[in-house]
Design a protein with these regions (language model features):
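PLP-dependent amino-acid enzyme catalytic core
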Residues: 1-115
Length: 115
């Protein structure tokens, strides 16, 4: 698989002002256990508590004005729902989030907080 670092740079420029720069940490115990240098990206510290915000923000930032004027729709029972709602709020775009009846109550409440 080839990575196009230009595309990664373009994506980063689109989202950098809308996301939290989360820390990258290492752990000596894990490193010794695996005999490797391992890093953890603490996306649980992201605005919505997960990495999903990066993708949702990038997608919403990439939409045409026609699509933006119509708003966005997402179906999710959790982190993606929160990410789309938050990203739409940040860009002042209408978002309709559909969640299953059995979605965790905390996820429903957190998503509603974003409008």
């Amino acid at each position: 698989m080839n990575f196009d670092f230009k595309k990664i740079e373009i994506a980063y420029k689109k989202i950098k002002d809308s996301i939290t720069k989360t820390p990258l940490v290492s752990n000596d115990y894990i490193n010794n256990l695996l005999d490797a240098e391992v890093y953890f990206k603490l996306e649980n510290l992201q605005n919505t508590g997960s990495f999903k915000l990066r993708g949702a923000t990038h997608k919403i930032s990439s939409l045409s004005s026609d699509v933006i004027n119509n708003g966005v729709v997402a179906y999710s029972s959790g982190n993606h729902a929160q990410a789309v709602a938050y990203a739409a709020l940040q860009k002042n775009i209408s978002a309709k989030i559909i969640m299953p009846k059995n979605a965790p109550k905390i996820k429903i409440e957190n998503t509603k907080e974003y409008g």
